[in-house]
Amino acid sequence: MSTGSTFKAIGKKVLSSCEMPLYSREVQSQIACQVNWIDDCLRSSRRQLSALDDLVKSQFVEMFGDGEWTSKTIGELATDIRYGTSKKATECGKYTYLRMNNLTDDGKLAYDDVKYIDLSGDELEKCQVVDGDLLFNRTNSREKVGKTAVFHGDTSMVIAGYIIRVRLGEEMRSDYLSVFMNLSTTKAMLRSIAKGAVHQANINSKELAAIKVPVAPIELQDRFLDFVARVDKLGFDCCREIVCCGVLFSSMSASLLCT
């Protein structure tokens, strides 16, 4: 239906010729009520999801933000800090290739848009991620630079050059550090130390290694992460409700248009 060589467009004539079911006003009112109900459910679930994220961060500040704990740099806590590979991704390959778009703004890993790559030997060892590795997005826009998430899983994956892999020693859990890195205060600090232009800001491995983190006892870190796990379960329920709302809306739309 669309035309045009530079960009696709639908003309007025084509649009005017489109047919659609014409329901009575009463039925239209019922449909509007159903759509509004789905929209309300969707908005509510998204608000709950955002509130749960805020809850985790506020709990972190409450437990560890009073200055009681000795601080150490990430460099002192890490056993290895390493850049990813600069090799180009492909549509096929042995290993999933994690890029900066796979790290979300809220500290998660998203796998809905991945590339692949083939590596071997020393290069694979340097760039491969294992369960518990902390991933840090070193180059991005100034607003997004410093995105941080933890890799969990046993599937072999490789990181791109815009990501720094951090492996921690026994003093700190990577998920604890990830929550710290995703605090609004930490993100503001990351923006302040990032070098470069607005659309291409950078934080190198030395600058990352110099960041100080409160080092609470492992037992207390684990207690906090137990709390995070319970909140994550609630978050999973919210995500499931969001998906269900989307499916319900699509199903209802298809049913109405096919009538």
How would you describe each model-predicted region?
Residues 1, 9-11, 125-182, 204:
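A short beta-sheet element
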Residues 17-36, 40-84, 210-225, 229-259:
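Non-catalytic DNA-recognition/assembly elements of restriction-modification systems
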Residues 75-87, 101-133:
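Sequence-specific dsDNA recognition surfaces
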Residues 94, 113, 160-162:
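A generic structural signal for short beta-strands and their flanking turns/coil linkers
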Residues 3-26, 156-163, 172-175, 190, ...:
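A short glycine-rich beta-alpha junction/loop motif
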